[in-house]
């Protein structure tokens, strides 16, 4: 049972597919966060290692993790945000995939492995904090919005240090800081390759950009994409934004399958990726039983919406003798 503290509530993302703990008194995730997560997720594979810097309550990582099986490390300075992030991760049963660290992003290289991440995602403080500048009296909100604990160059330097060669950084920021992002990127071996602007309404100046940069990438070939409109004339979200906010999670399919081995025996198994599993069996990496009985042929399969049922069918098939298996397969119209 996840406990909520005073002023906390549970909000939803992706319709009602994800839950997240927020506090009406502190900084909540915004559309900026979801736009960043939506763009970055396209670069993330199931085996990717991803780090989110300035992660807040882990909204971006939760969103991205819903679309793949990658592992995420989140770094957030503020204790109250870390608490909400960790409980939100638990609320969505993602403890084995998202790890939340409390610390200053400047120090991330001391507790995260350098040169090891495929993707860095960051929604940094947007505004500088010159002497005498009036800040939000709420310290938590001031830190989230202004460069009080870390500045833009430091964030880019840390991002570059964590990325593998050719790894990608995705950053959401204000257009007026774009020149600095490009400059600091070159300085720290991060070549900006794509800039995606967003406008509140067509005809207005951009008020947000998402930048994609590549570590040790070539300095030429920057693509400035057509601006995406956020709001219709009546103030409602455009179809492009609705797609991001209400995107449906991919439905994972689960299979019970039967292989015919080279010695004429049968092997029953479970998978959620038929092609990859068959390739594994025929390369000798699928199972101890099939390793010495290659090549194998998939002769029967059943599809299920849940993993448990498919694995029960695997167990059921394996615990019958040869005669029963032959009879079962013949009844299903399988010729062998």
What are these regions (language model features)?
Residues 250-287, 291-323, 332-336:
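GIY-YIG nuclease catalytic motif and its immediate N-terminal context
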Residues 124-154:
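Mobile active-site "lid"/loop adjacent to the S-adenosyl-L-methionine
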Residues 205-251:
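SAM/dcSAM-binding transferase cores
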Residues 2-44:
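Class I SAM-dependent transferase core
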Residues 40-122, 128-133:
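Conserved SAM/SAH cofactor-binding pocket of Class I
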Residues 17-18, 134-143, 291-296:
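Short glycine/proline- and charge-enriched loop/turn segments
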Residues 22, 102-103, 173, 196:
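Short loop/edge segments at beta-strand edges and connector loops
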């Amino acid at each position: 049972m996840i406990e909520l503290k005073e002023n906390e509530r549970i909000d939803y993302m992706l319709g009602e597919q994800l839950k997240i703990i927020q506090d009406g008194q502190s900084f909540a995730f915004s559309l900026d966060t979801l736009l960043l997560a939506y763009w970055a997720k396209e670069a993330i594979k199931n085996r990717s290692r991803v780090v989110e810097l300035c992660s807040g309550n882990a909204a971006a990582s939760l969103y991205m993790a819903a679309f793949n099986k990658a592992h995420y490390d989140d770094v957030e300075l503020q204790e109250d945000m870390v608490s909400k992030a960790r409980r939100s991760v638990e609320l969505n049963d993602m403890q084995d995939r998202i790890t939340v660290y409390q610390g200053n992003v400047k120090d991330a290289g001391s507790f995260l492995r350098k040169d090891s991440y495929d993707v860095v995602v960051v929604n940094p403080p947007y505004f500088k904090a010159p002497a005498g500048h009036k800040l939000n009296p709420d310290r938590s909100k001031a830190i989230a919005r202004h460069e009080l604990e870390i500045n833009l160059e430091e964030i880019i330097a840390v991002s570059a240090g964590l990325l593998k060669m050719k790894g990608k950084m995705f950053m959401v920021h204000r257009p007026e800081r774009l020149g600095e992002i490009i400059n600091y990127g070159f300085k720290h071996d991060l070549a900006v390759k794509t800039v995606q602007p967003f406008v509140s309404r067509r005809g207005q100046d951009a008020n947000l950009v998402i930048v994609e940069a590549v570590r040790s990438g070539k300095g030429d070939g920057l693509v400035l994409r057509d601006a995406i409109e956020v709001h219709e004339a009546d103030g409602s979200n455009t179809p492009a934004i609705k797609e991001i906010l209400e995107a449906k999670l991919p439905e994972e399919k689960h299979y019970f399958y039967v292989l015919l081995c080279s010695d004429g025996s049968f092997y029953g198994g479970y998978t959620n990726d038929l092609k990859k599993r068959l390739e594994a069996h025929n390369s000798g990496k699928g199972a101890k039983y099939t390793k010495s009985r290659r090549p194998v042929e998939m002769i029967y399969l059943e599809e299920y919406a849940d993993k448990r049922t498919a694995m029960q069918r695997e167990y059921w098939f394996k615990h019958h003798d040869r005669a029963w298996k032959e009879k079962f397969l013949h009844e299903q119209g399988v010729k062998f």
